[in-house]
A protein has these predicted regions:
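Membrane-embedded hydrophobic alpha-helical segments
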Residues: 1-39
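An amphipathic alpha-helical interaction surface
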Residues: 77-157
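Amphipathic, membrane-active segments
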Residues: 33-82
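Alpha-helix capping and helix-coil boundary motifs
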Residues: 8, 71-74, 125-128
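Generic N-terminal initiation segments characterized by hydrophobic and/or small/turn-forming residues
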Residues: 12-15, 20-22, 72, 104, ...
Length: 157
């Protein structure tokens, strides 16, 4: 013990040992938290890839490539298959409505905008080839915004 206000060496050692134990405990807690966060991030990244890769790399580009106008100046019915692929992607991404509702709503809203655009364009007739190309570019742009949105969120994980 303390004699005459001085702390003995054994007490100093005990105090240092206690501080080291507390510090070591705090570091353990922090590393568990960081590891859990990393596991969640890795899991989310895995889900993004699992859900979106097939659409972004294959299905969507193939459907967009088929978009064209028929000889009467109407949007070819191939736009319907693009629309169903987009809706299928949103359905398969429903997992994110639970873990990242803001992202899911953004994806859903952008896909609905594309749907509305496709319906709008398909309801009109475009005789002029330049006008037809402008509309195809609008469709490609809307699809591009959806893919960019997905990629942006994937890279933020």
């Amino acid at each position: 013990g303390a004699v005459g206000g001085t702390i003995e060496l054994s007490d100093k050692i005990s105090l240092v040992a206690l501080m080291v134990a507390i510090l070591s405990f705090a570091i353990s807690i922090i590393s568990i938290y960081v590891q859990k966060k990393l596991n969640t991030i890795n899991l989310d990244a895995k889900y993004y890839e699992l859900i979106f890769n097939q659409f972004i790399l294959d299905k969507i580009p193939n459907k967009v490539a088929l978009i064209k106008f028929d000889s009467k100046g109407k949007l070819d019915s191939s736009y319907k298959s693009l629309n169903s692929v987009m809706m299928e992607m949103v359905r398969k991404a429903r997992y994110f409505s639970f873990v990242n509702p803001k992202f899911y709503k953004g994806l859903s809203d952008r896909t609905k905008k594309l749907d509305e655009l496709l319906v709008e364009i398909s309801s009109k007739t475009y005789i002029n080839i330049i006008e037809q190309n402008k509309e195809i570019i609008r469709i490609e742009d809307a699809v591009s915004k959806i893919i960019t949105y997905i990629n942006k969120h994937h890279s933020q994980i």
